[in-house]
């Protein structure tokens, strides 16, 4: 019993460390995403102010085109961040399921 128990205990510790690391990564990515959203919001207003200031000038069309390109890239980055967060959450759930399976095995082992 002790050998099996020790193996299960080691696996559980290793998985717990992985879970903690995944949680930390997800938290950090979520922080970066919030910062990016704040940056995006302020940049959007600045771009609009610049475009309004250029109305009637020959640069207005170029600014509008550039703003649309930048908005596309920012949306793409936002989606990439969201995909990253989703994949980290899936990995966390997988690790939690593995830990739960070990709990079950340990309980079964203790009843022998």
PLM feature spans:
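Charge-rich amphipathic alpha-helical interaction elements
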Residues: 1-112
